[in-house]
From Swiss-Prot:
A molecular-function term among this protein's GO annotations: toxin activity
Similarity field: Belongs to the long (3 C-C) scorpion toxin superfamily.
Tissue: Expressed by the venom gland.
Described purpose of this protein according to its UniProt entry: Binds to sodium channels (Nav) and affects the channel activation process.
Protein name (database record): Putative sodium channel toxin Ts18
Keyword Secreted: yes
Length: 72
């Protein structure tokens, strides 16, 4: 009985840590804490998140191909 409680506690803490770590992976946040999206994109899409993760900060998100393009 004494062994089960710390074991379950460690598992629970690890799961919470994993959710908090990877929860921002799809929708990254800027330095002000706001979620980053493409201007013409809905809240459930990942295209702009991929663009921001690849550091195309001066680029834009192509809606058809979901690719990041750099502005000329």
């Amino acid at each position: 009985m004494n062994f089960r409680f710390p074991f379950l506690l460690m598992i629970t803490i690890s799961l919470i840590g994993a959710v908090l770590t990877f929860g921002n992976d799809v929708r990254p946040r800027n330095q002000y804490g706001n979620e980053i999206f493409c201007p013409h994109q809905g809240f459930n899409q990942k295209c702009n998140a991929i663009c921001k993760r690849k550091k195309y900060l001066l680029g834009f998100c192509d809606q058809k191909t979901c690719l990041c393009k750099v502005r000329p």
